[in-house]
């Protein structure tokens, strides 16, 4: 039995989708549970030549023997959720997905409030998906819950019960966090943050898992840092510099251009400390070091990349166990058997 929690170490967009895809395909957990804020975060998943953009469904959906769950701490937009059930019908996702009956619901009024607020949309850089206003209503104890939405009736379940029974029976459980450490309401670059905490402890709580049941915490970092929207960014470089390096990205949900910066060792250290990381995954190594594109053995990485990996381990005190060198599952160096 292993309970693994995966979280973003930066400001989101770290490549969590690729890591989740790889880990769930190889480790085949019985349950894949989605934690995090809600549909304001997008995970990009590429599997067998097809690309998917997800906002609520767990990114490990392609593992067709897994039960897919959305924890009580996650805000659910019924329109987004039901669209994804249809969108992913090829994988029989609707037959395998459960939504905790205590999830708070994002209503149209929440999206309108989010989008009409100049403070949220312009100063803070909100995605406009209604998460902040919906979470505010939950705090005020006025939010509608999933059990009150007829269209969700067939999907309702008790997520903590399912997850803990699976752990009791010796099954593997994988918890997907969303966004990243730098966007945490408590530990991020306040006020330029999301509407709740994004660390591993909260991700576990989102799905009803107590801290003593978590075995592994994987913090995901991109080999360079990106950020969508406003807020401090100590290692940011200009768009011109980013373009010269071949780094140009756009957000999955908003379509906004991502700001680019160099890897931030201090942020990585703090992120690993507060998340209690036991492992680190480093993604997009091929983007920063093209000579390492699709390399699949650690010994074949360039000396420069090896030094970079060693510097991360030295700064954080956490082993780098997963290195992504390309978009496909095969473009992954997995060092877990050697280091753990």
UniProtKB/Swiss-Prot annotation:
Q: In which residues is substrate bound?
A: 252-258
Q: Does the keyword Nucleotide-binding apply?
A: yes
CDD domains attached here?
A: AdSS
> Which pathway is this protein assigned to?
Purine metabolism; AMP biosynthesis via de novo pathway; AMP from IMP: step 1/2
SMART domains in UniProt = Adenylsucc_synt
Which family, according to UniProt? Belongs to the adenylosuccinate synthetase family.
Q: Subunit composition?
A: Homodimer.
What's the protein here called?
A: Adenylosuccinate synthetase
